[in-house]
Every structure is written in C-alpha cells, then in structure tokens.
C-alpha cells in the first residue's frame, strides 16, 4: 500500500518511535545477565519506562484519533481494550520486589510474556496503519486530519523523556521521511520470511528427486497410502524403480518385503507348505460353494479363507491399478505357493511385465494357458523361472517359453549366412551325410530319432539336379518354387511349423504371425528352413526375397530385436512336472539352445528319456553338473556327476520312487 501524504498520516511517525522502543527492549532482554541482580533491576526499570510510554501512546491515540473516528463510524469499537499494557506494568513492579532466589523463575516468565506482547503489539500497529488510516481519510477532511496530527505530535512531545529522545520535532519529521520509504519493509519482510519458512517446511515442496529417494525406503503398503495424498505423490509412488520386485503372497500375509529375491533361495519346510496347501484347498472349496449359494457366510471367520481372499484382492489390485504404470520396470515376480493365483492373472501380469528376469510360480495351480500371451521375444531378459510342483504344465508351456526367449543375434547371423551361401543342393546333401548338420543349421541333431527326409525350399531359378531331387515333391506356380511337405513328415503338431508355407501367406496370415515372424524360420533339422529362399510373388517388382528381407517385410519391428540379448535363461526348474516329455526338452534347444543355463531341475519328470536329456544338455554348454537334477531311474548324460533326483521321499511332488 502506498504511504499517505505526510500532512495527514497520523500513525507512521508515532509508530516508528514505538517500533524503535520494541527493538531496544528486545536487544536488552537478550543481553541481560539474569544472574546479576544489578543487570536484572536495570532491565526491569527500562521496561517499566518503555511500557509507560506505550501506554501514553495508546491513550493519545484513543483520545485524539480513535475516539473521533468512533463518533463518525459505528464500526470502530474496543480497539485498545485488550492491549495488556497495564498487566505488563504490574508484572514489572512485581519483579522489582522479588529476591535473588526468585529471579531465575521470574526471568523465564518475563521472556514468555514479552514475547507474547510483542507478537500482538506489532500486528496491532500495522492494523492501525492499514485499516484505520484509510477510514480516517474517508470520514475526515484534509484540513481536519492536519489539525489532528498537530495535536497528536504535540501530546507526544509534551512528555519530557520522549521529547529528549526525539531531540525535538525536527528529528521526528526526519523519522517520518525515512518511514515513508521503509514504512512496510520490516513488517513485509517478517511476513514474507514467515511465508517462506512455511512453504519451505512443507514436504510437498521437496524436489521430485528427494521425494523419490524418500519413497525408496517405504514398503508397498506405505507407497499405496502415499499415492492417496495428492496427484503429485500418486505419480511419484507409481515410479517403476520402486516396484522392481513383487511378492504378493508375502504381502497378503503381512510381510511387505520388496527387495531382491536372494533370501528366497531355500525351500520352505513341509509344515509351511502344508499350511499353504490347506489354505488353497479351503479357499477353492469356499469359492465353489459361494458360486452355488451366495447367501452363505463369507468365510471371513476361517483364517485360511481370509488369507486367500486378501491374496486374490491384492493380485487384482496389482493387475488393474499398478502394473499398467510400472509393468515394464518389474524384474521379479514371486508367487510361490500362492493360494489364489489363476491362469488369467498370470497371463495378465506377464503381458504387463515384458522385462521380467525372475519368475517363481512354485507349487501353483496353473496350466499351459497361463503363458498364452507370450509371443516371440516376449521375455528375452528372463533369467530365472521356477515351475516346480506345477503338475498341469506340459510340453506346450515349454514351446511357448522357447518362443518367448527369442533368438540370439549370433544365431540369427549364422542362419542368415547359411541362407546367403550359393551352394548347390548336392553340396548341402553331401555335407549332411558327413555329419556336419550343426554347421548348416546352427542346431544340434535333436530329431535323430525320426526318419523323415530333409526338405528344402529353394529359388526356382537355382534348382538342383533331377537326380538329387528325385525324392522331393516340388511344384512351380507362376515361377514361385514352393516345396510341399511329404505325408510321412513328422513335426510339431502345435509348433511353429504347422502352418502355411511362407510363400503362400495371405495378408491375414501375415498379420496373425507378425509377432512370431523370426521363429517362422525355426531351423529344425526336420524342417530344413535354414536354407529357404523365396522368389517374389507374381507381379511384384521385388526380386528374390531372402529370410532377412521377408522378416523385415512381415514384421518391421524385428530389427530392434536383433540388438537385444536373448535366451539368457540361467535357472530352470521343472521339478514335479511329470507331464513333460522329450518333445518339451527338445523345443528348448530351438533358436540357439540355452547357452547360459546353469541350473536345471527335472526331478520327478517321469516321461523324459536319456535321449531327450542328451539333446537338451548338448544345447546347454554352461550347465553345472552340481545343479543338474533328474530321475535316478533314467540313464542320462553326466550320470556320474549330476546330482540326481531331489524329490526322493517328497510328499508333495511327483517322484518315480514316491512309493518307497
């Protein structure tokens, strides 16, 4: 607010003097030695004189300013009714009569009372300047205000002590001039500093980096609570780095651990597992009954059902409210021994979390359909997968896993190099007879048990001799060379080869297989797709198409996959998955095998043979024999150094000797 003209500003000059007195007694109060009786009495005497001047000042304002204003405005009343000046004077008089033993207690009381008075007196003066001065300008004429000011100054100067301190009226006028410049600076600075302290003290105004660091110390439950405070906190609480490791089973039971999965390496005891199985059984029975009769009790009285319900609600909340925001940052998901996990929930979680590295589904009631959402390269970063005790898992799940692990760049280059060579069919066939099949296809001879002939699709402009192709069934349609499979060929019934030949794909089929394009050229030793070259369709202005160009045409995003790592799986446990066969083991060798696999547990896989094990082990060069487990009844690879079966005398997982 701009200062009023000097001639009619009734408050600025006297208030400047009052503020000067406040500053003086505050300084004396801080410098006084209260243990010294002399200093203490000197302070009280100074305070007594100061507050007498305060009281005189208030009396002058009441008589010459506020009293006149009340006569012209009914809104002004009781302005100085609670200034506590008289009470303060009584306090000072009482202090002068105290003895030395009472001084310290009195000093503390004095400081508190002075601090309270100061906090009221300064705003009171500011109110007079900002509220009553404009009212005076409204209800009085200019000349009337000039006369009032002269009377006010005369009354203040009539006091001997005041007149001496001000050194006459001229000094007062100089003070007024200065006050016009600094009138509101002190109070505004105090108010501004107070606001700054208030705003800076608020945790909501901390930088996002600091808030994120604070949130990193919170558990998932606390993060969810913080997300309900405001929009800013909700966004920070959904930061991916805070949700790298998910343990819904533990969280549902009150354990909010969210660190790396290192402490979960040890198997729980049978009692703990038995309790989890009882929970799952009780929940399933209750769930079935609830579907039939919804009027029955909710089952909250049963602790097992209550825990399973909490787990189910927690999983649903994760899927719907958290994973859509942080799914790409999730590295670990542990659902071991879950009572409420379903195929649908797992499928949704895996779709949201493409960068998963650690997946533990031990002893859950899932089946192959849980992995239906996996397409080519969907989990290229997966390093640890534990399916122990998942009795419904079959070879189909391993096919999906092999597809989702992708294909290493080095393996792709080797296949493409094989496509680009100009060798004749006779040369290839001769090399196959010499046993160099791995050099041609990049795969080991995993299908040596089958007698089907090798089948190649070649460019129609570069066909082999009729003698070499005598056993082939080959037809040409408008210059397009397409090789049809012979009836006696055995291949995956549900695998990547049971589909139309690439040269005859329609637009619909191309769209359907777009995501899995790189595995359409699987490199199976039976399918021989590693030597396929396709001539352009009739009417096309493109020349001969290689595998690489066809992949780019069908799935333009596949170029990015070449730059990523793939098939980095290090830990695979299928313990107790008794429906797994050699076929499931062999599909894991496709696309480059498992070059980083160190831990392989096939305990309780009753339907695999030594041949299937050998094919898989040959594609796992990093396998550690100490962490290689399979049934003792199987004559398999590394029989002398492998660790054997882990499920002996195990009451909750399949084992060929469980009856012993």
Swiss-Prot record:
Pathway: Protein modification; protein ubiquitination. Its main location: cytoplasm. Keywords: Cytoplasm, Iron, Iron-sulfur, Leucine-rich repeat, Metal-binding, Nucleus, Repeat, Ubl conjugation, Ubl conjugation pathway. Residues 200-246 form the F-box domain. Its cofactor is [2Fe-2S] cluster. GO terms for cellular component: nucleus; perinuclear region of cytoplasm; SCF ubiquitin ligase complex. Fe(3+) 2 binds at residues 58, 61, 80, 124, 127. One of its GO terms (molecular function) is iron ion binding. Pfam families: F-box-like, Hemerythrin, LRR_6. InterPro entries: F-box-like_dom_sf, F-box_dom, Hemerythrin-like, Hr_FBXL5, Leu-rich_rpt, Leu-rich_rpt_Cys-con_subtyp, LRR_dom_sf. It comes from the Eukaryota. It is found in: Cytoplasm, Perinuclear region; Nucleus. The keyword Nucleus applies. LRR repeats lie at residues 311-337, 338-362, 363-389, 390-417, 551-576, 577-604, 605-630, 631-649. Residues 1-157 are annotated as: Hemerythrin-like. Disulfide bonds: none annotated. PROSITE patterns: FBOX. Fe(3+) 1 binds at residues 15, 57, 61, 127. Ubiquitinated upon iron and oxygen depletion, leading to its degradation by the proteasome. Ubiquitination is regulated by the hemerythrin-like region that acts as an oxygen and iron sensor. [2Fe-2S] cluster binds at residues 631, 645, 655-656. One of its GO terms (biological process) is SCF-dependent proteasomal ubiquitin-dependent protein catabolic process. Part of a SCF (SKP1-cullin-F-box) protein ligase complex. The hemerythrin-like region acts as an oxygen and iron sensor by binding oxygen through a diiron metal-center. In absence of oxygen and iron, the protein is ubiquitinated and degraded. Component of some SCF (SKP1-cullin-F-box) protein ligase complex that plays a central role in iron homeostasis by promoting the ubiquitination and subsequent degradation of ireb2/irp2. Upon high iron and oxygen level, it specifically recognizes and binds ireb2/irp2, promoting its ubiquitination and degradation by the proteasome. This is F-box/LRR-repeat protein 5. The lineage of its organism: Eukaryota, Metazoa, Chordata, Craniata, Vertebrata. The gene is fbxl5.
């Amino acid at each position: 607010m701009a200062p009023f003209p000097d001639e009619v500003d009734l408050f600025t000059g006297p208030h400047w003097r009052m503020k000067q007195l406040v500053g003086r007694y505050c300084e004396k109060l801080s410098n006084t030695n209260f243990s010294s009786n002399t200093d203490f009495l000197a302070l009280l005497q100074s305070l007594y004189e100061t507050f007498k001047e305060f009281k005189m000042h208030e009396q002058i304002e009441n008589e010459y300013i506020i009293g006149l204003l009340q006569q012209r405005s009914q809104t002004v009343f009781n302005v100085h009714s609670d200034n506590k000046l008289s009470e303060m004077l009584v306090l000072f008089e009482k202090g002068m009569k105290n003895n030395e033993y009472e001084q310290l207690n009195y000093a503390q009381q004095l400081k508190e009372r002075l601090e309270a008075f100061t906090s009221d007196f300064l705003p009171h003066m500011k109110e007079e300047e900002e509220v009553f001065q404009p009212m005076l300008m409204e209800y009085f004429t200019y000349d009337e205000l000039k006369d009032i000011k002269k009377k006010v100054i005369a009354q203040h100067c009539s006091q001997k002590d005041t007149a001496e301190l001000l050194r006459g009226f001229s000094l007062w006028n100089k003070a007024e001039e200065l006050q016009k410049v600094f009138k509101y600076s002190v109070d505004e600075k105090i108010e501004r500093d107070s606001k700054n302290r208030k705003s800076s003290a608020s945790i909501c105004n901390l930088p996002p980096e600091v808030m994120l660091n604070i949130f990193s110390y919170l558990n998932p439950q606390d993060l969810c609570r913080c997300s309900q405070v405001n929009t800013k906190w909700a966004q920070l609480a959904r930061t991916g780095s805070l949700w790298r490791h998910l343990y819904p089973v533990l969280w549902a039971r009150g354990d909010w651990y969210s660190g790396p999965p290192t402490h979960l390496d040890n198997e729980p005891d049978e009692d703990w597992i038995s309790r989890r199985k009882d929970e799952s059984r009780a929940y399933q029975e209750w769930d079935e009954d609830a579907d039939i009769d919804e009027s029955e009790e909710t089952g909250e009285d049963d602790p097992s059902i209550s825990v399973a319900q909490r787990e189910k609600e927690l999983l649903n909340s994760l899927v719907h409210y958290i994973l859509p925001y942080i799914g790409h940052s999730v590295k670990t998901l542990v659902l071991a021994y879950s009572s409420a996990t379903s195929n649908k929930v797992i499928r949704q979680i895996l779709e949201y979390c493409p960068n998963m590295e650690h997946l533990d589904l031990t002893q859950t009631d899932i089946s192959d359909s849980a992995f239906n959402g996996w397409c080519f390269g969907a989990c290229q970063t997966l390093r640890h997968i534990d399916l122990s005790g998942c009795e419904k898992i079959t070879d189909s799940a391993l096919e999906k896993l092999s597809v989702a692990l992708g294909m290493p760049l080095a393996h792709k280059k080797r296949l493409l190099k094989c496509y680009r060579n100009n060798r004749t069919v006779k040369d290839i066939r001769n090399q196959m007879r010499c046993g160099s099949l791995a050099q041609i296809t990049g795969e080991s001879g995993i299908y040596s048990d089958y007698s089907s002939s090798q089948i190649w699709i070649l460019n129609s402009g570069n066909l082999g001799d009729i003698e070499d192709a005598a056993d082939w069934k080959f037809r040409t349609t408008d210059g397009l060379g397409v090789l049809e499979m012979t009836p006696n060929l055995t291949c995956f019934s549900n695998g990547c080869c049971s589909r139309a030949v690439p040269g005859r794909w329609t637009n619909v089929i191309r769209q359907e297989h777009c995501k899995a394009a790189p595995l359409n050229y699987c490199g199976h030793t039976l399918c021989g797709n590693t030597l396929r070259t396709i001539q352009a369709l009739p009417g096309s202005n493109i020349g001969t198409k290689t595998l690489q160009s066809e992949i780019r045409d069908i799935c333009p995003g596949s170029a990015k996959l070449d730059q990523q790592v793939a098939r980095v799986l290090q830990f695979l446990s299928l313990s107790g998955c008794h429906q797994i066969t050699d076929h499931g083991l062999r599909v894991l060798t496709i696309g480059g095998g498992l070059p980083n696999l160190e831990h392989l547990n096939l305990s309780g896989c009753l339907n695999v043979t030594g041949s299937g094990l050998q094919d898989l082990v040959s594609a796992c060069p990093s396998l550690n024999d100490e962490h290689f487990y399979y049934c003792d009844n199987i004559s398999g690879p590394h029989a002398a150094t492998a660790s054997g079966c882990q499920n002996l005398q195990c009451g909750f997982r399949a084992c060929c000797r469980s009856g012993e």
